[in-house]
Amino acid sequence: MLFNKKTEEKVHKGSVLVGYDLGDDFSQISYCVYGENVVESVATVIGTKQYNIPTVLCKRKGVNQWLYGKDAVKYSQEEEGFLVTDLIELARKGGMITIEEEAFDPVALLTLFLKRSLALLNFMVTAENI
Protein backbone atom coordinates (compact mmCIF):
# COMPACT_ATOMS: atom_id res chain seq x y z
CA MET A 1 0.00 0.00 0.00
CA LEU A 2 1.44 3.35 -1.04
CA PHE A 3 -0.35 5.41 1.63
CA ASN A 4 -2.00 4.44 4.85
CA LYS A 5 -5.50 5.76 5.53
CA LYS A 6 -4.33 8.77 7.59
CA THR A 7 -1.80 9.85 4.97
CA GLU A 8 -4.36 9.42 2.19
CA GLU A 9 -6.87 11.58 4.06
CA LYS A 10 -4.26 14.34 4.47
CA VAL A 11 -3.35 14.22 0.78
CA HIS A 12 -6.96 14.38 -0.39
CA LYS A 13 -8.51 16.52 2.38
CA GLY A 14 -10.63 19.19 0.73
CA SER A 15 -10.23 17.66 -2.72
CA VAL A 16 -13.25 17.68 -4.96
CA LEU A 17 -14.16 14.84 -7.32
CA VAL A 18 -16.00 16.00 -10.44
CA GLY A 19 -18.27 13.95 -12.66
CA TYR A 20 -19.24 15.17 -16.12
CA ASP A 21 -22.10 13.54 -18.01
CA LEU A 22 -21.56 14.68 -21.59
CA GLY A 23 -24.67 13.88 -23.59
CA ASP A 24 -25.71 14.54 -27.16
CA ASP A 25 -28.61 16.79 -26.16
CA PHE A 26 -27.91 17.70 -22.54
CA SER A 27 -24.96 17.53 -20.17
CA GLN A 28 -24.74 17.56 -16.39
CA ILE A 29 -21.98 18.22 -13.84
CA SER A 30 -21.77 16.68 -10.37
CA TYR A 31 -19.19 16.95 -7.62
CA CYS A 32 -18.34 15.45 -4.26
CA VAL A 33 -15.92 16.60 -1.57
CA TYR A 34 -13.44 13.82 -0.80
CA GLY A 35 -14.48 11.80 2.24
CA GLU A 36 -18.11 12.92 2.16
CA ASN A 37 -20.91 10.72 0.94
CA VAL A 38 -22.96 13.49 -0.66
CA VAL A 39 -22.87 14.07 -4.41
CA GLU A 40 -24.18 17.45 -5.56
CA SER A 41 -25.32 18.35 -9.06
CA VAL A 42 -24.43 21.77 -10.41
CA ALA A 43 -27.46 23.93 -11.16
CA THR A 44 -27.29 26.12 -14.24
CA VAL A 45 -29.05 28.84 -12.26
CA ILE A 46 -28.00 29.17 -8.62
CA GLY A 47 -30.79 28.29 -6.21
CA THR A 48 -32.75 26.21 -8.72
CA LYS A 49 -32.90 22.53 -9.58
CA GLN A 50 -32.13 23.13 -13.25
CA TYR A 51 -29.28 20.69 -13.81
CA ASN A 52 -29.47 19.99 -17.56
CA ILE A 53 -27.14 22.03 -19.74
CA PRO A 54 -28.07 21.96 -23.43
CA THR A 55 -25.02 20.60 -25.26
CA VAL A 56 -24.96 23.41 -27.81
CA LEU A 57 -23.03 26.55 -28.70
CA CYS A 58 -24.19 29.69 -30.45
CA LYS A 59 -21.97 32.14 -32.31
CA ARG A 60 -23.39 35.64 -32.14
CA LYS A 61 -23.90 37.27 -35.53
CA GLY A 62 -21.13 39.57 -36.66
CA VAL A 63 -18.85 39.08 -33.63
CA ASN A 64 -16.58 36.34 -32.34
CA GLN A 65 -18.62 35.70 -29.19
CA TRP A 66 -19.75 32.21 -28.27
CA LEU A 67 -22.53 31.31 -25.85
CA TYR A 68 -23.27 27.87 -24.47
CA GLY A 69 -26.24 26.03 -23.01
CA LYS A 70 -29.49 27.87 -22.39
CA ASP A 71 -28.03 31.23 -23.44
CA ALA A 72 -27.04 29.68 -26.76
CA VAL A 73 -30.57 28.38 -27.31
CA LYS A 74 -32.06 31.76 -26.35
CA TYR A 75 -29.86 33.76 -28.74
CA SER A 76 -30.51 31.39 -31.63
CA GLN A 77 -34.29 31.54 -31.04
CA GLU A 78 -34.07 35.33 -31.11
CA GLU A 79 -32.18 34.96 -34.41
CA GLU A 80 -29.16 36.76 -32.97
CA GLY A 81 -26.76 33.89 -33.59
CA PHE A 82 -25.97 30.60 -35.27
CA LEU A 83 -26.72 27.51 -33.18
CA VAL A 84 -24.28 24.58 -33.33
CA THR A 85 -25.88 21.32 -32.21
CA ASP A 86 -24.54 17.73 -32.29
CA LEU A 87 -21.18 18.88 -30.88
CA ILE A 88 -20.09 15.35 -29.96
CA GLU A 89 -20.96 13.86 -33.34
CA LEU A 90 -19.33 16.74 -35.22
CA ALA A 91 -16.14 16.30 -33.16
CA ARG A 92 -16.14 12.54 -33.88
CA LYS A 93 -16.51 13.09 -37.62
CA GLY A 94 -13.84 15.78 -37.84
CA GLY A 95 -13.84 18.24 -40.70
CA MET A 96 -14.63 21.90 -40.32
CA ILE A 97 -17.85 23.78 -39.63
CA THR A 98 -18.48 26.98 -41.57
CA ILE A 99 -20.36 29.85 -39.95
CA GLU A 100 -20.49 33.29 -41.55
CA GLU A 101 -17.83 32.22 -44.06
CA GLU A 102 -15.39 31.30 -41.26
CA ALA A 103 -14.25 27.72 -40.61
CA PHE A 104 -14.24 26.27 -37.08
CA ASP A 105 -12.77 23.03 -35.78
CA PRO A 106 -15.56 20.98 -34.12
CA VAL A 107 -13.12 19.55 -31.54
CA ALA A 108 -12.21 23.11 -30.54
CA LEU A 109 -15.92 23.95 -30.27
CA LEU A 110 -16.60 20.92 -28.06
CA THR A 111 -13.61 21.93 -25.92
CA LEU A 112 -15.03 25.45 -25.64
CA PHE A 113 -18.37 24.02 -24.51
CA LEU A 114 -16.64 21.90 -21.86
CA LYS A 115 -14.58 24.83 -20.56
CA ARG A 116 -17.55 27.19 -20.40
CA SER A 117 -19.83 24.68 -18.71
CA LEU A 118 -17.15 23.58 -16.22
CA ALA A 119 -16.83 27.23 -15.20
CA LEU A 120 -20.15 26.71 -13.37
CA LEU A 121 -18.10 24.86 -10.74
CA ASN A 122 -16.38 28.14 -9.82
CA PHE A 123 -19.50 29.08 -7.85
CA MET A 124 -19.25 25.89 -5.75
CA VAL A 125 -15.57 25.03 -5.30
CA THR A 126 -12.12 26.46 -5.93
CA ALA A 127 -10.23 25.19 -8.96
CA GLU A 128 -7.21 24.24 -6.82
CA ASN A 129 -9.30 21.61 -5.00
CA ILE A 130 -10.43 19.78 -8.12
Task: List where the protein language model places each region.
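Short glycine/proline- and acidic residue-enriched helix-loop micro-motifs
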Residues: G95-A103
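Phosphate/pyrophosphate-binding loops at sites that engage ATP/ADP/AMP, CoA/4′-phosphopantetheine
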Residues: S117-I130
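Early-domain small/polar-rich strand-loop-helix modules and first-structured segments
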Residues: M1-M96
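Phosphate/oxyanion-binding active-site loops and adjacent basic polyanion-contact surfaces
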Residues: A103-L114
